């Protein structure tokens, strides 16, 4: 795990002169945080799904590649005839399955998983920023 330090903005809350303005901002921030919390939950679930799927797809792809190698060597020693034709058909089906799995690797593989993890980190930073904003506004409200 990597911990990232990020910049929290210094808000100009000293310009707030009325408690009502603080209340409006706090209400808005609550809604923002609720939206971000929901988004975080969605991204967490999606990230978990990508993690599971990426391992599953990689395993399936390795199995198909191994099976293709075996079928290739089997075809090479077979004489022409119906058994060889059947093996060639099986090879064609395996190549298509490999093609589909390679497409899934692009969609759900390690790169896609890392993109989802980055999305999750970004949402977590946005939530931290909203929390900092709320703390600044609440401190100003208390001072008014």
Residue ranges of model-derived segments:
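Extended alpha-helical coiled-coil "stalk/arm" regions
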Residues: 46-95
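Long, amphipathic, charge-rich alpha-helical segments that form helical bundles/coiled-coils
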Residues: 88-110
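Surface-exposed polar/charged interaction patches
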Residues: 35, 74-81, 97, 104, ...
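Amphipathic, well-ordered alpha-helical segments in soluble domains
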Residues: 32-35, 39, 67, 97, ...
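Long, charged amphipathic alpha-helices with heptad-repeat/coiled-coil character
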Residues: 36-54, 102-141
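Short, Lys/Arg-enriched N-terminal segments with co-localized hydrophobic residues
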Residues: 1-8
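Short, charge-rich amphipathic alpha-helices with coiled-coil/heptad character
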Residues: 8-50
């Amino acid at each position: 795990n990597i911990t990232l330090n990020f910049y929290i903005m210094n808000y100009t809350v000293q310009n707030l002169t009325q408690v009502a303005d603080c209340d409006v901002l706090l209400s808005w921030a609550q809604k923002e945080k609720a939206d971000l919390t929901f988004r975080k939950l969605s991204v967490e679930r999606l990230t978990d799904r990508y993690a599971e799927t990426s391992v599953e797809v990689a395993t399936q792809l390795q199995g198909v590649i191994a099976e293709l190698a075996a079928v290739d060597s089997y075809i090479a020693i077979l004489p022409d005839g119906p058994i060889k034709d059947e093996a060639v058909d099986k090879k064609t089906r395996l190549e298509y399955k490999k093609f589909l799995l390679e497409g899934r690797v692009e969609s759900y593989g390690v790169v896609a998983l890392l993109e989802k993890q980055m999305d999750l980190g970004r949402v977590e930073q946005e939530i931290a920023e909203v929390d900092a904003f709320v703390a600044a506004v609440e401190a100003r409200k208390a001072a008014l």
